[in-house]
Amino acid sequence: MRRILPILALLIFISGCGVNQNTNNSNTESNAKSSSISTQDSSKMTKLDSHLTVAKQALSAGDYAKAIEEATASIKDNPNNADAYSLRGLATALNGDTTKGLADTKKAYDLDPNNVANYYNMAMVYKLQGQLNESKQWFEKVLEKDPSNTWSVYGIATIYADQGDDTKALDWLEKAINIDPSVKAVAAEQDHFERFHNNTRFKTLVGL
C-alpha cells in the first residue's frame, strides 16, 4: 500500500485540477450557447456536475466503489463525458480491475485527446498493471503540456527506481524535489526508494 496511497493522494489533486480546467473550458463554451440550452438540460448538467464532485470525493477517501458508482451515473447522464470515464477508469483500476480501468481511460482519451489529467490517470493505470514503459510514456505526455508537473516527474523517478536504473531514478527525483520540496517526505516513505536508504545521494536529496 505504501507504493500506491501516497501517490494516490497527490494524484487526486492533479486529477481534480485537470477536471476543473476542463469544466471551466466547457463552461466558457456553454455560456456562448446558453440561449439554446433548455431548463431541463441545465438541470441535467447540474446533476452531472454533482455526480462528478461526489465521485472525486469518494476517490479521495479511498471509496472506489462509490467513485465508480457516481462516475457511472455521470456517464449515464452524458455518454460523452470524458472526465467521468477518466475518473471511473482510475477508480476501477485502484479497485483491482486494471483491464476495465484502462478501457475507461482509453475511452476518455478517445472523447477528449487533450485532457492532460487523463494522461496522468492513464499513466497511473498502466503503472498499476506493471506496464512501466507505457506508464512512463504517458507521464512524458503530461510533461509535454506541463513541464513542471511535479508528480509526473516523480512518477518517472519511481519507474526508473523500479526498473533498477538508480542514476536516472535519482536524477528525476532531484528534478521533482526542485519543483516541490514536499516530494522529499513522500520519497522517504515509499517502497520504490526503500533500497536507496543507504545511498548517500538519496539521503542528501530527501534529508535522511
Q: Model regions: which residues?
A:
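Structural signature of tandem alpha-helical TPR/SEL1-like repeats
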Residues: 61-70, 94-107, 129-141, 164-172, ...
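Canonical tetratricopeptide repeat
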Residues: 87, 121, 155, 189-190
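Position-specific recognition of the canonical hydrophobic site in helix A of tetratricopeptide repeat
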Residues: 59, 86, 92-93, 127, ...
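Structural marker of alpha-solenoid helical repeat scaffolds
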Residues: 77, 111, 145, 179-180
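Alpha-helical segment of the N-proximal tetratricopeptide repeat
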Residues: 44-83, 94
